[in-house]
Amino acid sequence: MKRRRGAGNPISTGLKKILGGRGALVHDAGVLTPDPAVIKDSLCAVSRQLGFSGCRVARAEKSPHAEKLFQWLERGWHAGMEWMARSPERRTDPAEVLLGCRSVICLSYDYDSPAMRPEGEGSICLYAHGKDYHGILEEKLADLQELLSIYGGKQKGYVDSGPVMERDHAEACGLGWRGKSG
């Protein structure tokens, strides 16, 4: 799938709609800096245009479940998932992944739709229908990262594949919760 550029790009379209009449810069000790409220509004509006159903921002804090992860690894419960044991500190603290990180943007994307449900008797998990969601969402994240770069931000985007404990951040900002699997 080709990335959209120019006038049809949700980034440029979204920014024109959102910023019309509002200043994107505020004075901070005599220096013009991006207004966090405008950045958040822009981000959430563009994320909706890209098909995300939820957009929330959490503080980039160390995971409250860090100790549980360390114990889980110590006990060898990660079985053949050796990557889990590499740099566990990075999994529990966003600042270890991106120096100076202050916020974690959490997004949700609904993949349950009648069009995705196959006819017939058998059933499989809805996320397994259609194309692999990783590639689809990674492209959408690239568009959002482009928006944040316009404001001078440094960021990293992951689709359940990075070292961050995304459940903790999603729960902290009200976009998710911890189920029985912890």
Map each language-model feature to its residues.
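Auxiliary alpha/beta "docking" domains used to position bulky ligands
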Residues: 2, 15-182
